[in-house]
């Protein structure tokens, strides 16, 4: 089972974006985020919500960039 990591206040372009990642751990979610978006600082300062024990394959689930 993986966890869902819901990241808010990321991918900012005037307004905040959001990313959802399924991963075994926060460290694994960070690796997925940095590989896709090349922005470790964005991950490190994100607002997190974690939903534990979901039946979803590891990886990037969904994302939306902020915009204005």
Model segments located where?
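A short, exposed loop/beta-hairpin motif centered on an aromatic-Gly-Thr core
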Residues: 15-24
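Intrinsically disordered, low-complexity segments enriched in glycine/proline and serine/threonine
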Residues: 11, 27-29, 55
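A short, structured loop/turn motif at beta-sheet edges
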Residues: 1, 23-29
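A broad, low-specificity signal marking well-ordered, structured residues that form hydrophobic/aromatic
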Residues: 5, 21, 62-63
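Short aromatic-glycine-(Arg/Gly/Cys) micro-motifs in beta-strand/loop hairpins
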Residues: 1-16
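Short, mixed-charge low-complexity intrinsically disordered segments
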Residues: 35-68
């Amino acid at each position: 089972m993986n966890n869902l990591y819901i990241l808010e206040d990321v991918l900012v372009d005037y307004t905040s974006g959001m990313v959802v990642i399924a991963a075994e751990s926060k460290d694994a979610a960070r690796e997925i985020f940095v590989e896709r978006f090349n922005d470790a600082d964005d991950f490190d300062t994100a607002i997190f919500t974690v939903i534990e024990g979901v039946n979803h394959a590891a990886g990037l689930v969904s994302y939306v960039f902020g915009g204005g």
